Design a protein with these regions (language model features):
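Short, polar/flexible loop-turn hinges at active-site or ligand-entry regions and domain interfaces
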Residues: 124, 150-152, 170-177, 197-204, ...
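Short, charge-patterned binding micro-sites
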Residues: 185-187, 362, 368
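Basic, low-complexity terminal or inter-domain segments flanking catalytic cores
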Residues: 2-3, 35, 166, 222, ...
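Short glycine-centered, acidic/aromatic-flanked micro-motifs in structured strand/loop junctions
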Residues: 150-152, 336-338, 365
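Amphipathic alpha-helical transducer elements in NTP-driven molecular machines
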Residues: 9-16, 43, 98, 104, ...
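Intrinsically disordered, low-complexity regulatory segments
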Residues: 1-217, 506
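Long, highly charged, low-complexity internal segments
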Residues: 39-47, 51-125, 234-353, 357, ...
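C-terminal or mid-to-C-terminal helical accessory/interaction module adjacent to the motor/catalytic core
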Residues: 142, 184-270, 319
Length: 864
């Protein structure tokens, strides 16, 4: 039996489906899905891993023996030498407090004193997927050969190498081969398995070097920043060798913006049109002096044209220019283009991975921008036309013309640029997937098409002796723009005018303006800047940016640093500037590239990185108090939402020690007891300027961002008139009417929780109450539900009016569930509750077993 090891379950299934002539049989080994099939008359089985099956970590301590020197001991009793420098103190120690032990140092707990030892502690690999490893070994015992078919890059080669090491524990003599492919098309997979190669151990070692270096740097720096401020693990402050200089780029740009001194300038602009033309045919005109830096000169010129109604055409100039088609997509350029379409780099990679696994696009983590000669471009275009009717006309033109693909600056031999495979069914894709797939498909076609021709018409006008200009671009020859309209400006057609013609002018105004500071990075631009500075890799840049958002060092898009992010970079720049510079990170990445090429060893590169980190840590430990104070001030600044209306001190976001829920409290506590509730399930941020203070009650106003919903602004004071909704009668109580009494159904809003509901005025007698959606203006209709007799109301939301029966147990809910709600019977709810409890208990047990041997150091590693 031939054992084929893929990186994920979907990949295992795809490979089995592509290689077999029939349909693979899905089976299980223990609880792991596998796929059995025949290939070239031989029984085969594919198994998909879950990414890395081994995770790097540290032992609990480093110990010292006079004969053996420094070492660590694994759970299996294996002794690993630790290259602790002679300058660090050895036992016996003068103190018995943690982290000091009788025979060494504990590195399991988070203590500043242990960090110099942690820097040099040996790295071990623990099972991250025990069930998968068990299944893998079971299959290996029954196999006569192994094929590694993980992704062909550093991470994929390392995953394959780790899996192979586990296989060799039970079958050390199995022949091993490697399948390298760039897409899940039948032709590509078949070719890869017909032309097997050897596992590239240098590539795997380079991947492991990065893995170990990022663990060591992330663990040491994260623990240091956390301990400098908090003295414990509860409020982790993340850092890493790539993450920190990336944050420094954003902070550096913000400092440039803060230091920017705006300069005044003036512009004279208006509108023009051919005489008698419709209002829609007007065009923009501006004084030939685009910016007046002298106010008097601007006012003098404006005085000449103020009130002018006509102008004379002094000259008409037409010029054509060619716009060249774009180069093929690499990972960074795809992320930048997708960001311009509103898809973040991290989401782009998640979607691209799903499209790749579905066989719709080629491998998405690439640097290459040159199509290889082996790629049949014409065949891809033909296949694309068959599965994508909307692109069929463009595909036909591409096939009819000379196909000369563009070339980028980077050419590699591992994978081709990102392109659509021409297989699969794009019509089944959801919104985000379809958007990204179209971007890839259209970019691919654009790289095979000719340039676009744009004609510019420039008008020079005389307005009462003052020179004005107008300009417009028109797409004359679409070229590649027929396939790739992204970023194309709307045509600005100038009227057919000649020298000496008279045009009408309107609304000429003098505008005072100021120069703008450098723009903040968009996420797409930040990815490009990281690539330019040598920060991260094509596979890690998006996740690094996502991590910086997750730990609240960054906010918004365009990217803005938080006060905490600024404080950390300012402090690190002052006390350990090398860590914030891209140079050291770029140097380490260069070392890993040399390992990949076989020019250096993993051991040497990791040791070199430890030495660099030791120097950084030595400087930081001298300034722990100053750095901790800076972080503390920044944390308070980020948590501030406004001034307390009672005592004037800061109101800040706080977390309840009992409930772990968020609330707003005064920094003057316990002398000032002002607190405000915070809506649940939202991300809160302060407002700026006049909007930051409520005009009605003087309390702060905040911005609330629900998950995947439109943000809203509220006053934090729940009793404020701006939050108050007058009671609204929506109907009469049916239960009370049947009991011979009158009861009104009134819509209320709870001052304490902010929740809305409908309740009968005789609630104590009838118990009638209905929940309402949290947001949306409520309107009574005076109608009742024909099924249950409850009131019908209209809730006006951002997506339009929503007409509902307020009774959540109404039979109409069974027919057509209300948007965003799901009605269940008490019996089904009880079943689900019981099942949920069992599932939760099982998950907790599994989680405990899986993580029992993992230390908190792994959680601390910031960079991937």
């Amino acid at each position: 039996m031939k054992l084929i090891i893929a990186e994920k379950n979907d990949a295992a299934r795809q490979i089995a489906e592509r290689l077999t002539t029939g349909k693979p049989k899905k089976d299980k080994v223990y609880n792991t899905a596998i796929y059995r099939f025949e290939w070239k008359g031989e029984e085969c089985v594919t198994i998909g891993l879950a990414g890395h099956i081994l995770a790097p970590d540290f032992c609990d301590s480093v110990l010292f023996d006079k004969k053996l020197g420094w070492y660590s001991v694994t759970e299996d009793g294996e002794m690993l030498p630790a290259d602790i420098p002679d300058g660090l103190a050895r036992p016996p120690y003068d103190t018995k407090r943690k982290p000091f032990l009788a025979d060494g140092i504990s590195i399991k707990g988070w203590k500043l004193e242990s960090l110099p030892y942690l820097t040099w502690a040996p790295v071990i690999k623990l099972p991250a997927e025990k069930e998968l490893i068990r299944s893998l070994k079971n299959l290996a015992k029954k196999s006569d050969s192994v094929i590694i078919a993980t992704d062909f890059d550093r991470e994929g080669e390392l995953i394959g190498s780790d899996a192979l090491n586990k296989v060799r524990e039970v079958a050390p003599d199995l022949p091993v081969a490697r399948a390298q492919y760039s897409s899940f098309t039948k032709a590509e997979i078949t070719q890869a398995f017909d032309n097997l190669v050897s596992l590239d151990q240098n590539l795997a070692d380079a991947g492991e070097s990065r893995q170990h270096i990022d663990l060591i740097w992330g663990a040491v720096l994260t623990r240091y920043l956390t301990l400098a401020k908090f003295g414990g693990f509860g409020n982790v402050r993340s850092a890493g060798r790539v993450q920190t200089p990336t944050l420094a780029l954003v902070v550096e740009r913000e400092r440039e913006r803060m230091a920017f001194v705006p300069e005044d300038y003036w512009q004279i602009r208006g509108m023009g049109a051919a005489q008698g033309a419709a209002e829609d045919d007007r065009f923009k005109i501006a004084h030939k002096t685009a910016r007046f830096t002298d106010k008097d000169a601007a006012e003098t010129a404006y005085g000449h044209v103020d009130g002018a109604t006509t102008a004379t055409v002094a000259a008409v100039t037409k010029r054509s220019r060619k716009q060249q088609p774009p180069t093929p997509f690499a990972t960074t350029s795809l992320q930048a283009a997708a960001a311009a379409e509103g898809i973040s780099p991290a989401r782009t990679m998640r979607i691209a991975e799903s499209l790749y696994m579905a066989g719709l696009i080629s491998y998405p983590r690439v640097d290459n921008t040159v199509y290889p000669a082996t790629l049949d471009l014409g065949a891809v275009v033909s296949d694309l036309a068959k599965i994508n009717p909307a692109l069929a006309p463009v595909c036909k033109k591409v096939l009819a013309g000379p196909m000369k693909p563009t070339r980028g600056k980077v050419e590699t031999t591992d994978h081709p640029p990102i392109y659509p495979t021409g297989e699969g069914d794009p019509s089944t894709l959801d919104g985000g997937q379809r958007k990204l797939y179209d971007l890839v498909a259209r970019r691919f076609l654009a790289t095979l098409m000719g340039p676009a021709t744009i004609e510019n018409t420039k008008l020079e006008l005389d307005v009462n002796g003052e020179p004005f200009v107008a300009s417009g671009d028109v797409l004359v020859t679409p070229g590649f723009r027929e396939a790739y309209p992204y970023g194309l400006k709307r045509d600005e057609q100038m009227p057919p005018l000649e020298q000496g013609d008279t045009v009408d002018v309107f609304d000429i105004k003098l505008e005072a303006k100021q120069t703008e500071p450098p723009a903040r990075y968009s996420q797409g631009k930040l990815v490009q800047e990281m690539e330019k500075r040598g920060l991260g890799t094509k596979s890690t840049r998006a996740s690094i940016i996502e991590r910086l958002y997750a730990v609240r060092y960054l906010k918004n898009d365009p990217v803005e640093p938080s006060q905490l992010g600024i404080a950390i970079i300012d402090a690190l720049t002052q006390f350990a500037p090398r860590i914030t510079s891209p140079d050291m990170t770029s140097e380490l990445d260069g070392d890993m590239t040399r390992v990949e090429r076989g020019e250096d060893t993993e051991e040497h590169v990791v040791t070199h990185s430890r030495a660099l980190l030791a120097g950084v840590l030595d400087e930081l430990l001298k300034h722990t108090q100053e750095l901790g104070d800076a972080i503390s001030d920044a944390v308070t600044a980020d948590a501030r939402v406004g001034a307390c209306p009672k005592c004037g001190k800061d109101l800040v976001m706080k977390t309840s020690a009992k409930t772990r829920g968020s609330f707003i409290g005064c920094m003057g506590w316990p002398d000032c007891d002002v607190t405000y509730p915070v809506p649940s399930g939202v991300k809160v941020s302060p407002l700026e300027g006049e909007a930051a203070v409520c005009p009605e009650c003087g309390a702060p106003r905040i911005k609330c961002q629900p998950f995947r919903q439109k943000a809203f602004e509220i006053c934090v004071n729940p009793t404020c008139p701006t939050n108050y909704e007058p009671d609204l009668k929506v109907g009469e109580c049916k239960v009370c009417a049947e009991a011979g009494r009158h009861g009104d159904l009134i819509a209320h809003k709870s001052e304490k929780s902010g929740k809305r509901f409908i309740r009968c005025t005789n609630y104590d007698d009838c118990g009638v109450s209905y929940p309402l959606p949290a947001r949306g203006k409520l309107e009574a209709t005076g109608e009742t539900c024909p099924e249950c007799g409850a009131p019908i109301v209209v809730v006006n939301t951002a997506r339009g009016p929503w007409r509902i029966c307020v009774n959540m147990d109404c039979p109409t809910k069974e027919k057509k569930p209300a948007r965003g709600r799901k009605t269940t019977t008490k019996a089904s709810t009880a079943k689900k509750t019981t099942a949920a409890k069992k599932t939760t208990a099982a998950k907790k047990t599994a989680a405990k077993k899986t993580t029992a041997k993992k230390s908190t150091a792994k959680k601390a590693a910031a960079d991937k």
